[in-house]
Structures are given as C-alpha cells and as structure tokens.
C-alpha cells in the first residue's frame, strides 16, 4: 500500500504471472478491494477477526451477501463514485476484539438487518459453498447454518 500506483501494478502483475506460470496459489491480504478485484480469483471478507463472506471475486462485487461486505463496498471509492457524499461509511463501533467468546454475529450491533437470532447465535460460514455468507439475514441467497450444523469438506 505504500507503493506508488505504477510500482504496485508491476509487483502485482509479477506475482500474478508467477502464480499462473508455476501453477501455485497465492494468499493476498489487503484492505484495497480494487486491487483484490483485479488480482484475486476468490475473496474472503473479514470482520472483527472472523470470515463473514467468501466468494468468487466477481460475485462478491456484484452480489455481496453479507451486510458488512455491502457496507464496506459502498464506503470505498470506485469508478462510479462522483463525490464523497456518495460514500456510505459503516456505522457504529467494532465489538471488543479481546473477547472472542461473545455470542452472536460480531456485526449485529452495526447491522440494519439484525434480529434476536443475530445477537444470540453466531452464524457459520459454509466452508464448501462457492459463495457463502455468515449471516442469518443475507442480502442474497440462503441464510447461514448454525455453527453446529456446518458440513466440512
């Protein structure tokens, strides 16, 4: 992120071409969603230390399922953004990150779609699904499963 745009593009192109040439995977950790969109096949969105959505890159940007992902995307400038007024920041504050034992969804206090279920039971991200959101009330697709009923690959 500290690189100028030209150097950043050259480094990312090199990493991408080496990965394809050598048929290897790369793990790219970033806050730069535009960069991830250009160079990643799949994206996992994290919130408060937990994966909340996993999807093919194009699907994530066109049909975000988790409310946090949608808010994150709407708070980031893009090609269609004309002014700062069009950006929608994610409201509220993060939960206490020192407490991983808290029940419920970590985004519940900041979510417009929350219900009592969100506050009391943490949803699971389906590790097998192509596009999955750890959300009881996703914007698209089926709701999450409870943590005890998730199938594993």
Residue ranges: model-predicted function:
Residues 56-153:
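Charged, flexible cofactor/metal-binding loops and thiol motifs
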């Amino acid at each position: 992120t500290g690189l100028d745009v030209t150097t950043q593009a050259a480094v990312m192109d090199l990493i991408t071409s080496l990965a394809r040439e050598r048929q290897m995977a790369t793990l790219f950790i970033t806050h730069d969603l535009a960069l991830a969109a250009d160079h990643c096949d799949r994206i996992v969105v994290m919130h408060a230390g937990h994966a909340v959505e996993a999807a093919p890159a194009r699907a994530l940007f066109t049909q975000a399922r988790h409310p946090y992902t949608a808010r994150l995307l709407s708070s980031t400038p893009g090609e269609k953004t004309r002014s700062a007024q069009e950006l929608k920041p994610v409201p509220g504050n993060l939960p206490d990150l020192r407490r991983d034992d808290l029940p419920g969804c970590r985004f519940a206090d900041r979510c417009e779609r929350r219900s009592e279920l969100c506050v009391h039971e943490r949803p699971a991200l389906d590790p097998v699904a192509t596009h999955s959101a750890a959300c009881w009330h996703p914007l698209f697709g089926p709701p999450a499963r409870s943590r005890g009923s998730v199938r594993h690959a």
